[in-house]
A protein has these predicted regions:
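Catalytic domains of carbohydrate-active enzymes, especially glycoside hydrolases
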Residues: 22-43, 106-107, 114, 118
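Structural motif corresponding to alpha-helix initiation and N-cap regions
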Residues: 19-23, 52-60, 104
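Short, conserved active-site loops that position catalytic residues or coordinate cofactors/metal ions
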Residues: 32-45, 75-84, 123
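Boundary/entry segment of secreted carbohydrate-active catalytic domains
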Residues: 1-20
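Active-site acidic/histidine proton-transfer and metal-coordination neighborhood
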Residues: 67-69, 83-143
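Hydrophobic faces of well-ordered beta-strands that scaffold small-molecule active sites
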Residues: 6-12, 37-39, 73-78, 118-120
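Alpha-helix-loop-beta-strand connector modules within alpha/beta enzyme cores
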Residues: 56-78, 141-143
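Glycine-rich, proline-tolerant flexible connector loops at the mouths of alpha/beta enzymes
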Residues: 38-66, 122-127
Length: 143
């Protein structure tokens, strides 16, 4: 039997307000004894709110800090996306398309380019749809 590779990682969200740049929070996490880190799309480089130039620059800085300190962001996730929209289950297709094109595809691309894992819960089903079996079935099929 081949076992999966498992990392004990520290989420960098605790550093959000005081250690903002990768070169400040990454050595702090390394000093705590972690070499694997989980970073949040939301706190670092939300694709819906930041420019491509900023995101590219952020990753250049992250890569330099990883090399300098011997730690690596192994996974990215989103929690904030979960709370601000019903996401892929939104009844308006325009919202769904915007999330897919503006957030999900760029997030997958970024994680893939870095050979990193990613996770998120990007859908919520509105109550009025949950109470209507036909609408719920349609929504479930879309997901």
């Amino acid at each position: 039997m081949e076992y999966p590779k498992i990392y004990l990682a520290l989420d960098n969200c605790f550093a959000l307000k005081r250690w903002v740049e990768p070169e400040t929070w990454l050595p702090l996490i390394k000093d705590l004894g972690y070499t694997s880190i989980q970073a949040s799309y939301d706190n670092e480089f939300d694709m819906l709110y930041n420019t491509k130039e900023y995101i590219d620059s952020w990753f250049e800085r992250l890569t330099a800090a990883e090399k300098q300190y011997g730690a690596k962001v192994q996974s990215f996730y989103s929690g904030y996306q979960t709370y601000r929209t019903s996401g892929l289950a939104h009844p308006d297709r325009r919202v769904v398309n915007s999330i897919v094109e503006g957030w999900i595809k760029p997030a997958v691309k970024i994680a893939g380019e870095r050979n990193a894992d990613m996770g998120f819960a990007l859908h919520g089903i509105p109550e009025n749809i949950m109470q209507n079996p036909e609408k719920y079935r349609e929504c479930h099929e879309k997901l």
